[in-house]
From Swiss-Prot:
This is Ribosome maturation factor RimP. It is found in: Cytoplasm. One of its GO terms (biological process) is ribosomal small subunit assembly. The keyword Repressor does not apply. Residues 191-205 have a biased composition (Acidic residues). InterPro entries: Ribosome_maturation_RimP, RimP_C, RimP_C_sf, RimP_N, RimP_N_sf. Residues 224-236 have a biased composition (Low complexity). Belongs to the RimP family. Keywords: Cytoplasm, Ribosome biogenesis. Disulfide bonds: none annotated. The keyword Cytoplasm applies. GO terms for cellular component: cytosol. CDD domains: YlxS_C (cd01734).
Length: 257
């Protein structure tokens, strides 16, 4: 699927934030457009106290390290003046990443043919969560088809999802998606690849913690050194997962006024 999709700064998002995140989005969306960037998402978290996570990109979907720093420098004083958070916070600016949110019609068009998770509100025919392969949105940008795997007999395998009811959507991380993302954006730097390996290890550890396995019985006695005592990590045969481009700033309460 070609990545040459027409998109511009004026294209509205289908998904909007609420509460403090909405106030942050309102404060920065216009200035971002003035710099040639589009806001993807604002999310608040309790990481390191309070963290404001901002995803942005250019209309063509790219976002370099220089872009990230430029956005961080531009919106930091704006948030200082408007003070939508109302306290000290950490500011993180990043690219959308590979398993990115889909927030505009052009996002669905650009990533047609790839797997995604979509949530609707209100539900469609009693169902609000869908996972499958995206098709291209209809010419009016009203609906997007999704092909569902393993559908029960008698039920449709393709459903047209109304984008006006979109609550949340994001791509599903697959080897195919990683390869295509690398093709479009270029390979990551060496340090980014190392960070990606660490993130991948954390994901594996989290999965293991959620589904613990019983350890095999080990007889008591002196421990013998053995090259097979510690299982070796299997080499990844596919492309490495690049990390998102990110810049962070700490905003102390005393510096907000």
């Amino acid at each position: 699927m070609s990545s040459e999709i027409e998109a511009d700064l004026s294209e509205k998002r289908l998904v909007r934030e609420a509460g403090v995140a909405a106030r942050v989005a309102q404060a920065i969306e216009g200035p971002l457009a003035g710099l040639g960037f589009r806001l993807v998402r604002v999310r608040m978290s309790n990481v390191n106290g309070c963290t404001v996570q901002i995803m942005a990109e250019r209309p063509d979907g790219t976002f370099t390290i220089d872009d990230c720093e430029a956005v961080s420098r531009a919106i930091s004083p704006i948030l200082d003046v408007d003070d939508p958070v109302g306290g000290a916070y950490n500011l993180e600016v990043s690219s959308p990443g590979i398993d990115r949110p889909l927030v505009r019609v052009s996002d669905f068009a650009r990533w047609a043919g790839y797997e995604a998770k979509v949530e609707l509100s209100p539900p469609l025919d009693g169902r609000k969560r869908f996972r499958g392969i995206l098709g291209a949105p209809d010419p009016t940008g009203t609906t997007v088809p999704i092909d569902l795997p393993d559908v029960k007999e008698g039920l449709p395998s393709r459903i047209d999802l109304p984008l006006k009811d979109l609550a949340e959507a994001h791509l599903v991380l697959t080897d195919e998606l990683i390869r295509e993302s690398l093709r479009r954006g270029g390979p990551p730097a060496a340090d980014e690849a190392d960070e990606a390996e660490e993130a991948e290890d954390e994901e594996v550890a989290a999965e293991s913690a959620s589904s613990p396995a019983r350890a095999p019985f080990q007889p008591k006695g002196p421990r013998k050194a053995s090259p097979a005592a510690k299982p070796q990590k299997q080499a990844r045969t596919g492309p490495k997962k690049p990390v998102v481009t990110k810049a962070s700033r700490l905003k102390d309460r005393d510096s907000l006024h």
